Amino acid sequence: MKRVLLLLLAVVCGHALERGRDYEKDKVCKELSTLGKDDFRTLSLVLYSRKFPSGTFDQVMKLVKEVVSLTEDCCTEDADPGCYDNRTSALSATSCESDSPFPVHPGTAECCTKEGLGRKLCMAALKHPPQEFPTYVEPANDEICEAFRQDPMEFADKFLYEYSSNYGQAPLPILVSYTKSYLSMVGTCCTSASPTVCFLKERLQIKHLSLLTTLSNRVCSQYAAYGKEKSRRSHLIKLAQKAPTAALKEVLPLAEDITNILSKCCESTSEDCMAKELPEHTVKICDTLSTKNPKFEECCQEKTPMDIFVCTYFMPAAQPPEPANVELPTSKDVCDSKNINVMDQYTFELSRKTHIPEVFLSKVLEPTLKSLSECCHSADSTACLNAKGPVLKKEVSSFIDKGQELCAGYSENTFTEYKKKLSQQLRAKLPEATSAELAELVEKHSDFASKCCSINSPPNYCDSEIDAEIKNLPEP
């Protein structure tokens, strides 16, 4: 499977590697022969659905059909030697046409300014940002079976497209394994004498794989949005907030461990990478943090490692042990090459003492830490930090205050209670507002809070939304 997936990734846009087109073509043809047309087509559909999540079903299917066709045609013994290269070149040319039948990527136009191999490599490298809000909703059992009985192949194709485009950040082997298991369940239960009983039994069998798929999609989406270093900081912030009585030396290795796991597993073609690494990580969490917060202790009583990880992942932040009054590090500390953890220490202290969602802290820490580091490259680092320090501290404090105002009460109440209290607060602030205006404001603020005021809020979406919401806050 590992080699197959790697080669299919190469096929996506005729990705001829430096070792040569003939070498690549031979590999692809061998895998087509090994897999067979149907499995090759299925994997291609999963890959393109992930790669082009904004493409329509018809667009993705046309691309799949074309790639499978050219691979079949060019892999026959009597195929023209230039068949593979010519057909993949024609495929990339068609992708550049204004009325292209294939899915479009925002970066396609730039790739189309290149020619030949450069264009193919450019298109092969295109990636969509993570789908931070999956919209796939599984139909009811009777709807599933009705669609399956009408056309089993079309049902399978549409499911593969919809699920893969929504959960495309899950590691490819996990995504393939789950979708294959799901379709097997549908085929079994929709031909069963007791479909309802069958679905209950089969869903229980694939529950672990389903959970692994959706959760790995979520953590890998955040990793893709942040990148390795920001992801590391993000996990440090979350752990500091969940275990504010722990020490940096206890939470930093855990933040680095989960970041390394995501770095290794999110793009891995190994079928058991995530399934093997996450349980080992949960053991480290429980060994280190179960005495730091009763909620960690509760989570560590769950039956399976995956259940433990889910419990700790969704655990809310604890109440800070003391009010936030964190001093910026000095120029001596910041610029001392031996003091490698000074930025982490500042991040840790600010996070554990601040009751504000991680996306807010990550957003304000990025420019703050960058400004501190820049002082080390100035002619007089001490003077630089003395000048910037008070301004940075004021900006951080102001941003945190605004973030706390935007998310006040969200994590402490049910959503219904939160909206009720929000309505009362807005009514007190805006006594002249009409009922309709008030209702609109409540919906707007509560929608923002539901997406950006939790500990695992999506960074890409919330980055711009936070700016917009803060801009609309009245000046004190």
From Swiss-Prot:
Range of residues in the leader sequence: 1-16
Alphabetical UniProt keywords: Actin-binding, Disulfide bond, Glycoprotein, Repeat, Secreted, Signal, Transport, Vitamin D
A GO MF term: vitamin D binding
Domain Albumin: 17-208, 209-394, 395-476
Disulfide bonds: 29-75, 74-83, 96-112, 111-122, 145-190, 189-198, 220-266, 265-273, 286-300, 299-311, 335-376, 375-384, 407-453, 452-462
SMART domains: ALBUMIN
Chief subcellular location: secreted
Residues bearing carbohydrate: 86
SUPFAM superfamilies assigned to the protein according to its UniProt record, in alphabetical order: Serum albumin-like (SSF48552)
One GO term describing the cellular component: cytoplasm
PROSITE patterns hit by this protein: ALBUMIN_1, ALBUMIN_2
Pfam families xrefs: Serum_albumin, VitD-bind_III
Subcellular location: Secreted
Residue intervals passing through the bilayer: none
Highest taxon of the lineage: Eukaryota
Family indicated by similarity: Belongs to the ALB/AFP/VDB family.
Subunit structure: Associates with membrane-bound immunoglobulin on the surface of B-lymphocytes and with IgG Fc receptor on the membranes of T-lymphocytes. Interacts with LRP2; the interaction is required for renal uptake of GC in complex with 25-hydroxyvitamin D3.
Function: Involved in vitamin D transport and storage, scavenging of extracellular G-actin, enhancement of the chemotactic activity of C5 alpha for neutrophils in inflammation and macrophage activation.
Protein name in UniProt: Vitamin D-binding protein
Organism of this sequence: Oryctolagus cuniculus (Rabbit)
